[in-house]
Amino acid sequence: MLKTDFNQPKGSTIGVLRDGRTIQQTFDKMRYADTIQELRTMEPVGPRDVATVRRATEDSVLVNAPVYYDKNDTTSPDDGISVFVTAGGARWKFNTFKGYCAGLAGLKEDGSNVTTVVNGIVNRIVAKMVAAGRVNNQQRTVNIPVTGDAPEWKLTGPLVWPTVISLVFHGSVLLDGTSLTAGKILNCNNVPFMDRLTVAIMAAGTNPTDRPGRVNQAVGRAALTCIGGEVTVRLPGTQMDGSNNPTIHTVGAMIGNDAACLLDARDIYFEKFNIIGAKTGIEFGCYNTFMCGVEHFNVSRCYDGFSSPTLGSNYGERMYLRNGTIGNMDRHGAYLVGGGDFTLENVSVDFLGGDLAHFGPLSPAEYKHLSGHIEGVKGSLAAKEMPASYSKALVILGKAVRRDDRVVDQNDYRGVRQLFACPQNPYGRMLKVINESYAPGREGQVPNNPYPCETGWPGNSGVELILPKDTFVDTPYVNSYSPAVRNSVNQTISFTTASTGPLGGNVLSTDYAFAAEIIGGATCSYGTPAEATSDGYMPFIITLSDPSDVVYLFCTNRFRPGSGQSVLWGNCSVTLVGTTGSIILAPVIASYLGTTWTANTTTGAVTATPIRRGIQEGGTVDMSALAAAGGIPNGTYQAMPSRSVQGFYLGCDHAVAGFKITGGTGQVRLKLPVWWFR
């Protein structure tokens, strides 16, 4: 309220508080302490006395922290962060309703003691939890004020705190840990506190009164965040040895329990942070750690982006990475030795020396990249080491994932190559991949790989690759050469040494899997083991004596198209030996509709002969031009880019697929012919 003071010039007013004191009188009563040491020498003068502490120490950050006298408290110990006891036994208290202040605990302006101060506050908070016998309803936030222009603070060791405490930086800061060669630098982990915190303390106050025996543990939520900026941790890198192995072993951010621990790490997340130069950017705990993640993050110049490093227990449910980048890894984007269900949304991956997702031999982990960008992966998009159990790993690349399959430089090869890997093993297909991503950048790329298949050579049979029909925006390729999961219309893709000499000419025969129809002086015969390459597959040997020669190589496995609009795709692996001119390949379909019945009046036998209605030819490929453009020498196999064919007869009884080879002279060696519908 305001009142007129008649002792002052006319019209003057002064403020009056509810207790009758004027504002000036209140200002006159305000007390200041330059340091906490000075505060401890100030005795309260009244039951509602307040004071302001400018700094914790002479060289600490300016905080101007308000404290109040609590006349009812005569027992609380001086904790150095929120309770300060005078010589006369009075308790000055800092109101912690917004959390504890690292500045009031002595954080220096240059941040050189940030490790000591933050870990000290954490230990005092834990002591309060232990004294109270509970985590719930305890203040668990540590506010860390950042001052100055472009602050760069020196870390003297890791920051370590349990998952029920939150670190909140106020302002952007660079935490320089380049002198640290080991350890988990941002270590949100319950294991170091198991000697003090117990399940009973974590669970106190969480259970309904009618079920006192049930255990619900406290959760932490925002374990690391930044208001008004971001936190950057810079570490010394990996410093590879002569065998290309890292000599420095740091983890940028540890989220969860890294050893056996009954204290839950649940529902916690890091946000607004960068990790630069660690061996592992982010490690997720493998013991009682679940529903944890990171948001608005960047991991750069590390050995591995993030990891699940061991097979623990009760962990990995609904882990997530959102709105971030994993870039310039020496090795893998995700290194998953343990389990866990990891979902990536709006995450970009730029340049990896190894694999996008790499699984250990026992890993049952799930890697689900639902949206974002993938670029520059030198290794596989997904790879699993030789499986040692029935532990199937799962990878899902979503429709909103755009890939650029180049490796490093702008002009790098981005065409078809092996993208998924799991070796043949006693347990079956232990890497399952559902790939809905798209890679328009590889259109028009000349193949420099022998196998037109994203699972690579036929021996890579531990992969089950599923390519949903409605997701392609670029040329599709066959999903696998493995007969157990291949989506082709022909189950037979090769022949054995029992097949020798020229191929038979009866496309309707069921005695053999392949047949050839020849126009002109060409020949088509089975290859021999001596003509096989290291994969063991023998080729068909096609010799053209004149550019007008035509060879139709058919697989006699019959199929029936689903509709007249179905598009059949085909590809194979080809090498040219001593050819001239342009060797042209195209997929074809021979359609059969109706039957001619022939009766033998002598024997009474009746023969049924399907009527061929025509051969439809699909898109062509000039393999000679392709080999020249790709620098592929004679005798080296090259993938035929997939081409489609359409136009078979509606309602046809059956069809057979094949390739047409024509256009030049010389020898064409063709192996692994495959045809499939999307």
Curated annotation (Swiss-Prot):
The keyword Disulfide bond does not apply. The keyword Cell inner membrane does not apply. Functions as a receptor binding protein (RBP) and probably mediates the attachment to the host capsular exopolysaccharides. Displays a depolymerase activity that specifically degrades the K56-type polysaccharides of Klebsiella pneumoniae capsule, which allows the phage to reach the host cell membrane and bind the entry receptor. Its main location: virion. This is Depolymerase 2, capsule K56-specific. Homotrimer. Interacts (via N-terminus) with depolymerase 1 (via N-terminus); this interaction probably gives rise to a branched tailspike. GO terms for biological process: adhesion receptor-mediated virion attachment to host cell; symbiont entry into host cell via disruption of host cell envelope; symbiont entry into host cell via disruption of host cell glycocalyx. In the N-terminal section; belongs to the Przondovirus depolymerase 2 family. The lineage of its organism: Viruses, Duplodnaviria, Heunggongvirae, Uroviricota, Caudoviricetes. It comes from Klebsiella phage KN3-1. It is found in: Virion.
